[in-house]
A protein has these predicted regions:
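Solvent-exposed, non-transmembrane regions of membrane-associated and secreted proteins
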Residues: 2-171
């Protein structure tokens, strides 16, 4: 019986989509519709040691900068100054794309590392709060470098927001 089952499983056809990217490698390889391979390099990497999260970030104009595939740089909120404001969003829940599912485990004082366009930016969590889901979030923008992370809260109709500020390293 087991041998018959193994033969059936082994003989099942496997469908591999050539249009689906291989995501979160150092370079993302994309096979487009005309069969040509396109390599998309990430522009950054988000690391949150406490929740064992490491995810690559892609240019705002890249097709890979979307919440269905990756941690996303929100287009309306990133400053042209790399040392300014950045807001990142990702799904939470039980999907394999729920990259921010454990964001609620962060506490004030936790560290987040952002590598962006060849520079490293260490951040520390300064505030954690929730807002009603309205399709936008209200943020307290300060006169300092800030990184915000946002996802759906585990509470119904709420948005979880993690506010951080850049750690200024003295030489």
């Amino acid at each position: 019986m087991l041998l018959v089952l193994l033969i059936i499983i082994i003989s099942l056809p496997i469908k591999i989509s050539k249009e689906k990217p291989i995501i979160n490698t150092i370079n993302t390889i994309f096979n487009n519709k005309n069969g040509k391979t396109k390599v998309i390099d990430p522009i950054g990497k988000l690391e949150i040691p406490k929740i064992n999260l490491t995810k690559y970030l892609y240019d705002q104009n890249s097709s890979l900068n979307n919440i269905e595939e990756n941690v996303t740089i929100l287009k309306e909120t990133i400053s042209k100054n790399e040392n300014g404001l950045m807001i990142l969003a990702a799904h939470s829940g039980d999907s394999d794309k729920a990259f921010f599912n454990d964001l609620d485990k962060l506490t004030i004082g936790d560290h987040i590392n952002l590598k962006y366009k060849g520079k490293e930016y260490p951040y520390i969590v300064t505030n954690i709060f929730e807002q009603e889901k309205k399709g936008y979030i209200n943020l307290d923008i300060k006169d300092e470098s800030q990184l915000f992370l946002t996802t759906c809260s585990k509470a119904p109709h709420k948005q979880l927001i993690i506010e951080t500020k850049k750690i200024v390293l003295t030489p």
